[in-house]
Amino acid sequence: MIDLKFLRENPDVVKQNIKNKFQDAKLPLVDEVIALDAENRATIQEANDLRAEKNKCSKAIGALMAQGKRDEAEEMKKKVAESAARLAELEALEPEYEEKIRKIMMRIPNIIDKSVPIGKDDSENVEVQRFGEPIVPSFEIPYHADLFETFDGIDLDGARRVAGNGFYYLMGDVARIHSAVTAYARDFMINKGFTYVIPPFMIRGSVAEGVMSQGDMDAMMYKIEGEDLYLIGTSEHSMIGRFCDQIIAEETLPQTLTSFSPCFRKEKGAHGIEERGVYRIHQFEKQEMIVICKPEDAMDWYNKMWSYSVEFFRSLDIPVRQLECCSGDLADLKVKSCDIEAWSPRQQKYFEVCSCSNMGDAQARRLKMRVKGADGKMYLPFTLNNTVVAPPRMLIAFFENNLKADGTVTIPEALRPYLGGMTEIKRK
């Protein structure tokens, strides 16, 4: 959500931003806000004028009574009563206008960074750089679900009977590697100076509305029936939500937090879930990182955060690349975002494993989060988030890139301490 004053003073900039995101249907929203804002400001001005007139009349009534001019005083009292009735009407209108404006403003996308490439959708995202040499295997690599089955490591049929498509049982060595990766990710981020957090796995509707657009909520979030609670789609939501309605002391910035949590998603978007596999599913686990910082520090943190993901994946011998998200691929709250994609030797292409985003002050504004500066003035912080790792999707890249021709999977050195020194796993 952008600043109302900015929209009022720069409507053409806001409209061009909407066009750059290929959301032309939202263009009328800008004029709607401007019209409602003008009406609200006129209402506020009239209310202020009436209050001033009321105060003036009240003083005059006292003077008239002191002079014995009772009839004139009574007439003025009637005038004050009429003004009071009108003032009550105006005061009732104010919150109505503000709520109408707020709801429309929530639908207007954030102003994207000037460095973001203009493009309609993810097909126009731009490769920035690669890290590690892509593997071209001399043997056939099975589809990941089939590969996991060779280690007795997955049961999709059982999960389908229990919960339907989009769920899984991981077992044995595959499950152990999953747990080892998450433990390693936790320690990796702690060593980067982040505070480890175990957050709530449910959030109130007001927090969900504060961290994402309504469209994203509808496509992603599971609501608890009869409760004002949603299952989190990522722990970013509950970690950022921790600071809602709070005044943060500037000297405590940056806030750098990392957490591991289950994530629950409807996946109602264009891709949907897989019939068989663990690439796009309803339930998974993820190590996340968030930063709350001064606006001027945000881009430095953005670059640090995505580089942490690259470093993490490279330590597991997985080649990756950075992909700059174009304007049309950015969610409405995002100022700038990039994906980290892992190499799939089986498919001979990259696929998304991490997403790093600078949200500007949008989440802070929605959640009423403020910072008290050293000079005593209040301002909105910037919020950023990034995936460290999200198994089991990451396991696809892990197994494919560490698979040998004899069917064994090599355990990278970084992971061995979390697997009791194990150096490889073998087919069952």
Place the predicted regions along the sequence by residue:
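TRNA-recognition modules of translation machinery and tRNA-sensing kinases, especially anticodon-binding
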Residues: 27, 130-428
